[in-house]
Amino acid sequence: MEPPLWQRLVAPLMYLLPWSDAIPLGFGPDGLFLQYPVLRPLVLPALPLMQLERSIPFGLGGLLLFFVLFLAVVRNPNVPYFLRFNALQALLTDIALIVLSIGFRLSLQPIAAGSLLLGTLSSAVVVAVLAILLFSLVECLRGREPDLPGISQAVRMQLY
């Protein structure tokens, strides 16, 4: 059964969460958005979410948003499955992105700060998250579940 139009329009908004966390990686010293200013308009859809995350003190905005999405959407059986699936998939993508970002900061930043290696890896992560966002957007608008290898299987195991 194909999800109704409102679900197909709301589901892609979930993927703005990992996109908002990938954007700072693109503004590093050799960041993608600094090298290619034509890509900067891609930041605009995530700005309201980034402002919301930063409006809560002590950096707890992202954590609060995570818990709201997880408890109010993913774990709520009254929310349609299509929205729950996409919310959890976006949250797992965001967790993977945060772990990568922390790994970059702890392992590569001290030894390769400002180097080509760090800039290349950061740009690759931004491009990967952008590809996930665009793929998920198209699949959601078509009314299909975006099938991300590894992540989608974990989502299905959690939701069933």
What feature does the model see in each segment?
Residues 1-160:
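Alpha-helical membrane insertion/targeting regions
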